[in-house]
Amino acid sequence: MISKANKNATRKKRHGRVRRTIIGTAARPRLNVFRSNKNIYVQVIDDATHATLASASSLDLEKGNTTDAASAVGKLAAERALEKGIETVVFDRGGYLYHGRIKAVAEAAREAGLKF
């Protein structure tokens, strides 16, 4: 009998492969997205110093639709990054498909002024 692959394990393997090439620096940090069933979390990370420069999550917001919350989190993360003087980032989708909540975060961050 063939066993079904665990979606999260497959995503983690995909994210590991991508992380070998995506590296955030102080000049161009990494915008990392983590999606749970209930919330979405975004961090702006400098991989050289292993420091989180800015972050936002749906826990900071009022209750709402998941896609609307994702775009609000993307906008909030972009505003916090711009306050710290970060204008360009490398987008790390965390092994997720560029669709739905991940796409909403990316588009809202771009509209708020981040370049990637």
UniProtKB/Swiss-Prot annotation:
Keywords: Ribonucleoprotein, Ribosomal protein, RNA-binding, rRNA-binding. The keyword Protein transport does not apply. Gene3D superfamilies: 3.30.420.100. GO terms for cellular component: cytosolic large ribosomal subunit. InterPro entries: Ribosomal_uL18_bac-type, Ribosomal_uL18_bac/euk. GO terms for molecular function: 5S rRNA binding; structural constituent of ribosome. GO terms for biological process: translation. Pfam families: Ribosomal_L18p. The keyword Ligase does not apply. Belongs to the universal ribosomal protein uL18 family. This is one of the proteins that bind and probably mediate the attachment of the 5S RNA into the large ribosomal subunit, where it forms part of the central protuberance. Part of the 50S ribosomal subunit; part of the 5S rRNA/L5/L18/L25 subcomplex. Contacts the 5S and 23S rRNAs. HAMAP family: Ribosomal_uL18_B. This is Large ribosomal subunit protein uL18. The gene is rplR.
